[in-house]
From Swiss-Prot:
Gene3D superfamilies: Aspartate Aminotransferase, domain 1 (3.90.1150.10), Type I PLP-dependent aspartate aminotransferase-like (Major domain) (3.40.640.10). This is Molybdenum cofactor sulfurase 2. It comes from Culex quinquefasciatus. Belongs to the class-V pyridoxal-phosphate-dependent aminotransferase family. MOCOS subfamily. Its cofactor is pyridoxal 5'-phosphate.
């Protein structure tokens, strides 16, 4: 196949039928199938029809349900080319649950060894904490090869993935027979059993257990079908099932258990012994619809099974993506991406449909993965960043020593955070992956996003904060120009040019309300961009909240406090920035108005309970429903500076005004000064008689790419911020009110008041 070409494995008709199943994606480009693939619309409808059309009792009650579960077991085993005489199947909560079960139950006897490859999933590393042996040995991939054992020896266990979830490298499955027959190099006195982590592999590949027969296989079904979640399996070869010594027993797993005497007898079958309590039987039954849907949308063709065709399709997309990204060049001919792979995508037998990379600036320095994730979100591209719960592969491919990893941890980086660059070196990477519903257009969207955001570079070099400040010699005292209030979290601003009172949480009535969906989840413009069109106003005299929207009549809501004991109110729970918040439902009338305005059913408006208090992390300062702090300060001079650096507002017909750009940053206190970015050095300041401490810089996200007057999404100014500050997307500073000047009881902020820097 020629470079950068893609030939579809599926027919035009098959592609069309598949596309009909995923219309809910709309304009979203989904590229995280290694995280979870997507369920088809007809699959979920079929599950619903099955559950509503039949009566499924507890399998401990109904023989019919129990028999159906056995049929599902047969179907799963058939998918993997085996049958109950060869393998027993234990349903678990997922791959992690299956691995934990093996770790807890495997009988190592007298000093057997637990061996694992370093590029295993974290769930395998966690096995070290519970295995019944002290001989725990990590090995490199290159050391995973058969030895010269003659049989017998200590019962030992080796765990490796069929496919690395970091970059899609496939381990040769012939190693299974070699190791189980001949042992491992360097472990002459051990008889090894293989535990295969198949979660990543089976999502898009055929695992033939008639050909390769590891003692244990662990997998999750949502990786294959997208639904149900929370369900996996442990497949145990019949020759190895006596090696699992289970101690705990739950309901349904014993023939007899006596309450007064410590006596019990386990059931005979593997599943009956290991499936404690009632299994998730409705989820298990829904696997039948998963198999049916997959085989209907991707039918077998000739000697190729459904999953074989999926494997060919995802590999072809992965190779096309790999080649396109590798071909990107900056104007100076430097590469735009650094790829983290162990193959060149030559062979489907050694490589799956996963591509892993980091983006590079034209000078060769790294772009942080958090920045790439933000920009992808702006372009409606869903991808995964970080280390993907595979610290070993991450460390090896990013060429980090143990000391480097510990240094990053001591610098504040933890798994799952956005601390993407430390000392200029990446702490993780970007991963894209493909499923049977992925298309060539998805790869093109990804590459277009990378080109648009990182290849089109300005010729001017970015300046450091210190250089910028030193270029401005004239100094005028900054002034408070405007106060912006956001009564409803993530809706439009109520702009004040006179004065406004403070309370113990910040500006009075700031982010006092929140819109939630029918599940009680707080809504933001990231999910529902049209929220910016709701512009609340506050009438202090009547103590009312007035909601405005360009397509709606105004709605007036009383803000008079209600007692939590009142029979007319409904207390609710929602979550804001990982904090559980108690709030009061504002009623059906305003809920209906908001649902119509935002064209989304089931929305509710909640008001933070008057006696509810959130506090800043590592502080006792109280805040309302704001994300991070009491106040966010934005300097108009900094916004002007930033606007001048934006090379092209190619998403808009004309450049935005300064006011509209300031609005994007959603600050509470808008100041103006001569020096752009001077606020970044402040630690204490005073506005009029009120003193504030600086809590730190504001980390920006894709919210600033939303035009607050129209809801239009753009790539700027986030792209320019990321470039100028070397991937650290910070703009504006957080403040907390400390005190008023001695002799002053005033708690009012006045627009026009001078701003005095107390400490830097």
């Amino acid at each position: 196949m020629a470079m950068e070409q893609f030939e579809s494995v599926f027919t035009a008709k098959e592609n069309a039928e598949i596309a009909k199943e995923f219309t809910r994606l709309k304009d979203t480009c989904y590229l995280d199938h290694a995280g979870t693939t997507l369920y088809a619309d007809s699959q979920i409808r079929a599950v619903g029809d099955c559950l509503t059309g039949s009566l499924f009792c507890n399998p401990h009650t109904s023989r019919t349900t129990e028999d159906l579960l056995d049929q599902v077991r047969f179907r799963v085993l058939r998918h993997f080319g085996t049958h109950p005489s060869e393998y027993g199947l234990v349903f678990t909560s997922g791959t992690t649950g299956a691995l934990k079960l093996v770790a807890e139950c495997f009988d190592f006897g007298d000093e057997g060894a637990f061996v694992y490859t370093r590029d295993n999933h974290t769930s395998v590393l966690g096995m070290r904490a519970v295995v019944g042996t002290e001989r725990i040995v990590p090995i490199g991939r290159e050391d995973l090869r058969g030895g010269r054992s003659t049989g017998g020896g200590k019962s030992s266990l080796v765990v490796f993935p069929a496919q690395c979830n970091f970059n899609g490298f496939k381990y040769p499955l012939g190693l299974v027979e070699d190791i189980q027959r001949n042992g491992l190099v360097g472990f002459d006195g051990d008889r090894f059993h293989v535990c295969l982590d198949a979660a990543s592999f089976v999502s898009t590949n055929a695992l033939d257990l008639a050909k390769h027969q590891p003692s244990f296989v662990c997998l999750s079904f949502y990786k294959i079908f997208g639904f149900p979640t929370g369900l996996g399996a442990l497949l145990v070869h019949r020759s190895a099932q006596n090696l699992l010594k289970k101690r705990y027993y739950g309901g349904g797993t014993v023939k007899i258990a006596m309450a007064g005497r410590n006596f019990h007898v386990k059931r005979d079958s593997l599943a009956d012994q290991f499936e404690d309590g009632t299994v998730p039987f409705t989820s298990i039954i829904s696997l039948l619809q998963g198999f049916e849907t997959l085989e209907r949308l991707v039918p077998a063709s000739g000697e190729l099974s459904s999953i074989d065709r999926v494997s060919r399709h995802t590999f072809a997309l992965g190779r096309y993506c790999f080649q396109r990204l590798r071909g990107l060049r900056h104007a100076n001919s430097n590469s735009v991406v650094k790829l983290y792979h162990d193959t060149e995508f030559e062979d489907r037998g050694s490589q799956g449909g996963i591509v892993n990379f980091n983006v590079l600036h034209e000078d060769g320095s790294f772009v942080g993965f958090a920045e790439v994730a933000y920009m992808a979100s702006v372009h409606n591209v869903v991808l995964r960043t970080g280390c993907f719960c595979n610290p070993g592969a991450c460390q090896r491919l990013l060429e980090l020593t143990d000391e480097d990893v510990l240094k990053q941890f001591n610098a504040g980086h933890v798994c799952g955070d956005a601390n993407d660059l430390i000392g200029g070196q990446p702490t993780g990477s970007v991963r894209v992956s493909f499923g049977y519903m992925s298309r060539r257009e998805d790869v093109d969207r990804l590459v277009e996003m990378v080109e648009k955001c990182y290849v089109k570079k300005m010729t001017a070099n970015g300046l450091t904060r210190k250089q910028i400040v030193s270029n401005y010699k004239n100094y005028d005292q900054p002034k408070l120009k405007m106060i912006c209030l956001f009564p409803i979290k993530s809706c439009g601003a109520y702009k004040i040019t006179t004065s406004w009172p403070l309370c113990h949480k910040g500006l009075k009535h700031d982010r006092e309300f929140v819109i939630v969906d029918e599940n009680g989840v707080a809504m933001t413009q990231k999910k529902l961009v049209e929220m910016c069109l709701i512009k609340p106003k506050i009438d202090i005299k009547t103590n009312t909240l007035i909601l405005t929207h360009p397509a709606m009549e105004n709605f007036t809501l009383s803000m008079e406090p209600l007692s939590n004991e009142s029979q007319s109110i409904k207390l609710c729970q929602t979550k804001v920035c990982q904090d559980n918040v108690q709030a009061i439902d504002c009623g059906d009338a305003v809920a209906n108005w908001i649902s119509i305005a935002l064209q989304t059913s089931g929305l509710r408006l909640l008001k933070q309970s008057d006696d509810e208090a959130r506090t800043l992390r590592k502080s006792t300062t109280e805040i309302a429903l704001s994300n991070q702090a009491q106040f966010l300060l934005i300097n108009q001079a900094s916004v002007r500076w930033l606007a001048d650096l934006v090379p092209d507002w190619d998403d808009l017909s004309q450049e935005p005004t300064l006011e509209s750009l300031v609005d994007r940053f959603r600050g509470n206190l808008i100041i103006d000064s001569v020096k752009p970015l001077e606020e970044s050095s402040w630690t204490q300041l005073r506005i009029g008689p009120l003193e504030f401490s600086v809590d730190g810089p504001c980390s920006r996200c894709q919210m600033i790419c939303i035009d607050q007057s129209s809801g239009t999404r753009t790539a700027e100014p986030l792209r320019t911020i990321a470039r100028e500050f070397k991937g650290k997307m910070r703009f504006g500073i957080y403040l907390s009110h400390v005190k008023s000047l001695e002799g002053s009881d005033e708690k009012l902020l006045h627009c026009g008041s001078p701003l005095q820097v107390v400490a830097e």
